[in-house]
Every structure is written in C-alpha cells, then in structure tokens.
C-alpha cells in the first residue's frame, strides 16, 4: 500500500522542474496527498467556461490553476536561488526542521 505523503506542504515556495511551466516559481496553494498532486500559484492555468447558475453568479470564461503532480516540483531555496533537495533535522526540543542540502539554511 502506498504512503500518502508529499514532500511539499501548503505555503511552501516551489519551482516547477518539468512540463510546459518549467522554471516557474510559486507558492503551494493546496496539497492533495491521496492523489499526489499540488496546486501552485500561477502554474498550469486552465480555461473554464462556466454557465450562469443565478443572477448573482454570472457565467463566463474563467482562468484558474489546476493540480500538477508533486513529482514535478522542488522546494525553492531563497538563499541558493534554485530548486533544492532538503533534509530533516530534529532539534533538542524534538522539533523537526527542513534544511537545504546545498547551503544548510532552514527552509
């Protein structure tokens, strides 16, 4: 049975490493661990044609972010200026922190 765990969390800054949006940076808006997908701000924009459901909700063409596989993104390190691998350190008080493997800064 596969483990439902992602290497990125909501609010993380990530960079896309493959696909049509390769190289784009953005914040993770939503994570779906069971599907292994994330929604990244400004990445994988799709066009939806919505029908008006009521006078308060008009229809029209809407542009919104669609989920992408989490394997297509890497955590972004501000210090290195690129996508990086990360490690996990356990502090004396038991708190876990993620750190950049290139520059050893906390992410």
From Swiss-Prot:
Specify whether Magnesium is a keyword of the entry.
no
SMART domains in the record? KOW
Q: Which GO terms describe its molecular function?
A: rRNA binding; structural constituent of ribosome
Asked if Ribonucleoprotein is a keyword of the record, the answer is yes
Q: Name one Pfam family in it.
A: KOW
Name one cellular component (GO) term: ribonucleoprotein complex
Q: Which GO terms describe its biological process?
A: translation
UniProt KW keywords: Ribonucleoprotein, Ribosomal protein, RNA-binding, rRNA-binding
The entry assigns this protein to a family as follows: Belongs to the universal ribosomal protein uL24 family.
Q: How does it assemble?
A: Part of the 50S ribosomal subunit.
The task this protein performs is described as:
One of two assembly initiator proteins, it binds directly to the 5'-end of the 23S rRNA, where it nucleates assembly of the 50S subunit. One of the proteins that surrounds the polypeptide exit tunnel on the outside of the subunit.
Specify the protein name. Large ribosomal subunit protein uL24
Species of the source: Thermoanaerobacter pseudethanolicus (strain ATCC 33223 / 39E)
Per the record, the gene is: rplX
């Amino acid at each position: 049975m596969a483990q439902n765990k992602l290497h990125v969390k909501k609010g993380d800054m990530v960079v896309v490493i493959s696909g049509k949006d390769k190289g784009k940076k953005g914040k993770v808006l939503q994570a779906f661990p069971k599907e292994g997908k994330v929604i990244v701000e400004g990445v994988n924009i799709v066009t939806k044609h919505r029908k008006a459901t009521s006078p308060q909700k008009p229809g029209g063409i809407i542009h919104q972010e669609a989920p992408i596989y989490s394997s297509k993104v890497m955590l972004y390190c501000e210090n290195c200026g690129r996508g990086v691998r990360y490690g996990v350190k356990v502090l004396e008080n038991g708190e876990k922190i993620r750190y950049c493997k290139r520059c050893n800064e906390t992410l």
